[in-house]
């Protein structure tokens, strides 16, 4: 490591070596006794007079040094910051220790008495100090000015130290996730766990990560969704279940996509997609109430999350945006001609009306959905696990919630006819032969379970990372994930 250290870092390393030589090795510390955090220190002493502070007992604190100005220091712990003062005349040995060994970035434990400076700033007058972790590398001087998202994500440990606004985002994320669980628990849902490794790919249309299970001598997938397992629980007699966890899709990375992401899927027996539409509205309202905020700025757009949200069918939306009424398009060939006219590229498996409707929506309509909008009744060809609409069998009882052009939630009345489900799986296999590498596999285990009978059921999936982006007003998914995957740093 030393060959790569610059001069300042070499100087820090020499200080560490001297600490060890003088029986002050910071890494031998195993217990740290503290009386206060920065927050409790401020709360207890901020309203005290100088005379009252003189009567207070000794206080011990710990934190990272983020600033040094002569004999004043600022340390920061999880809750905030505290100013320290070293009186050279009263504590000459302490000052010598500070002067010889201490650098910005070091983790220290201190004890002393609270005091007020001449400018009435609450400060700890240090009587004892010990370095408990030496910072060997030079920390950034102006981290707040850093705008390179990749650098911040790659060195999240520094980002969290010197950018407290980023720390607040992750605390808010934790609060949001707790609130989601609390809402569902209060509404009678049971949290469950299902396998991350899956023998059969299914539950969504996406490219998977593949691995090999040595003990079983078989290839497995990291799950792209947990839908199939959760529906098996409904078949097994559970009425309301949900699971929050990691999903994995071997696809692109951008400001709203991360191959490893957090999702929640929710299933309710004896319900349809309209029930889930109401549920997701109530859930988002509950989150806004817990945050005491209903208006959010996301990617320079003001988003109002007060319900009810807008609602429109996919075909109606396409007509509204493009003027094209797909209800009047009678066959695949007519749809193909429309696609050619409007420069919509078609893959081999997309040479039909249903896929073309979905492509028109994705290409021309998604980005127009700024205010929260439920887009309903997706084509059956792109919804292999959704129940068809009895009034129009080309379409399904499905919706997706869009906010600022981004999909936030996806829900549908679950297909529970095992014969129809087998047919849909077979159609997916046909598409795979035509080059669609995002299709589901034929899952005999699921078909067997479905054949024992699944009552009418509704399912809902929500992308937690995107929802947190919105509620924390972050423009990149990397800003709401502690350690997003990045290309190898060269």
Swiss-Prot record:
It comes from the Bacteria. Pfam families: tRNA-synt_2 (PF00152), tRNA_anti-codon (PF01336). Its cofactor is Mg(2+). Signal peptide: none annotated. It is found in: Cytoplasm. Keywords: Aminoacyl-tRNA synthetase, ATP-binding, Cytoplasm, Ligase, Magnesium, Metal-binding, Nucleotide-binding, Protein biosynthesis. Gene3D superfamilies: Bira Bifunctional Protein, Domain 2, Nucleic acid-binding proteins. The keyword Nucleotide-binding applies. SUPFAM superfamilies: Class II aaRS and biotin synthetases, Nucleic acid-binding proteins. CDD domains: LysRS_core (cd00775), LysRS_N (cd04322). Its EC number is 6.1.1.6. One of its GO terms (molecular function) is ATP binding. One of its GO terms (biological process) is lysyl-tRNA aminoacylation. InterPro entries: Aa-tRNA-synt_II, aa-tRNA-synth_II, aa-tRNA-synth_II/BPL/LPL, Lys-tRNA-ligase_II, Lys-tRNA-ligase_II_N, Lys-tRNA-synth_II_C, NA-bd_OB-fold, NA-bd_OB_tRNA. The keyword Transcription regulation does not apply. One of its GO terms (cellular component) is cytosol. Mg(2+) 1 binds at residues 400, 407. Belongs to the class-II aminoacyl-tRNA synthetase family. This is Lysine--tRNA ligase. It comes from Mycoplasma genitalium (strain ATCC 33530 / DSM 19775 / NCTC 10195 / G37).
